């Protein structure tokens, strides 16, 4: 393997991400022990996750692949397991989306981001976001099934996505949002779509008009 090759650089970047995730998992384990000492065993499992990993270089494919390691499989607590789980999910959905786009050459992918107003209560904000999305999906289904209900979300043929939660370092408020990998017709005016979605999203949430439609 030549130094500076694409495979080597890709592997180094992967290890850098794993290192950051490992540090985060250790921090979570320490937090658990500090606040719930009785959960020491559970915290220790998270702390020891990915203490060793085995990689092999497959020269015929020109890639490094992880072939072994110790993992806790607690993706809700462990950043390392969450990272690997999300990577597998992306691979699975990428294949499905690729198949759909092959059979429907007239569609293009866009990244659709929907958010709600920040707040101090994560559970309340999450329920608020889920409720707005449920109404959005119901309106879209009605519009696409022939009902008179009009919604700009009817322009989305299909989507797959995930929730993300951030907390303001200064305000301490929770910022929940959802990222959707969506498929729309190639001739869709994305700027007009974003504007109309923003107005409709404001009516659904009653506290936010933050919508972003980005071509991929």
Where are the regions that the model predicts?
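Divalent metal-coordination and catalytic microenvironments
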Residues: 71, 112, 177
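N-terminal regions immediately upstream of nucleotidyltransferase
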Residues: 103-122
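Short, cysteine/histidine-rich loop/knuckle motifs that typically chelate Zn2+
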Residues: 77-83
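Short, non-ligating residues that shape and space the ligands of small metal-coordination modules
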Residues: 87-88
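Short cysteine/histidine-rich metal-coordination sites, predominantly Zn2+-binding motifs
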Residues: 92-104
